[in-house]
């Protein structure tokens, strides 16, 4: 489940593995962005966002008989800044540059039972943002993206490993500074 609102600046993600499947994994992502056309012939664009976030995640790997090779699960959350530029030939946006800021990464193996954790914080902290070179002929889509990954592998028919990750973000402001280079 994922949602994003440019109007409110809120992002919400929830990702959960299918407990009936032996192997399952996937990403949930949501983002908000802005379109920018540089006002200088050549310049450095520095994209920044002001955000607060809260996360919760859980892994439950039940015990299995000693003859079973293993069962494991992992989850992680990240914030990403992404710059996409319009390709003048195709007219499509193409990813030019991205920066990932890890929030957490956890894993568990057979029989570790229920593990849950959470946290909160603010972005950018010490992160310098995302800088890209461009000019007045370019059009950029600059994105703030929240992403969670969950994955599991069960190797016993009755094992029901559960892996879940939730991430909520509030992004009240995003901005771009243009520094002329010509």
Regions of interest found by a model, annotated:
Residues 1-182:
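Mature extracytoplasmic or otherwise solvent-exposed domains
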């Amino acid at each position: 489940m994922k949602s994003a609102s440019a109007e409110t600046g809120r992002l919400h993600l929830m990702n959960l593995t299918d407990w009936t499947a032996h192997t399952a994994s996937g990403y949930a992502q949501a983002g908000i962005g802005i379109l920018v056309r540089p006002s200088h012939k050549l310049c450095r664009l520095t994209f920044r966002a002001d955000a607060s976030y809260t996360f919760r995640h859980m892994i439950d790997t039940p015990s299995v008989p000693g003859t079973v090779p293993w069962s494991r699960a992992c989850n992680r959350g990240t914030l990403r800044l992404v710059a996409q530029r319009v390709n003048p030939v195709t007219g499509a946006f193409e990813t030019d540059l991205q920066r990932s800021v890890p929030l957490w990464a956890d894993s568990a193996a057979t029989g570790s039972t229920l593990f849950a954790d959470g946290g909160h914080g603010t972005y950018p902290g010490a992160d310098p943002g995302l800088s890209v070179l461009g000019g007045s002929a370019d059009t950029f889509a600059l994105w703030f993206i929240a992403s969670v990954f969950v994955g599991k592998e069960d190797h016993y028919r009755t094992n029901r490993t559960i892996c879940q990750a939730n991430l909520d973000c509030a992004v009240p402001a995003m901005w771009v500074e243009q520094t002329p280079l010509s």
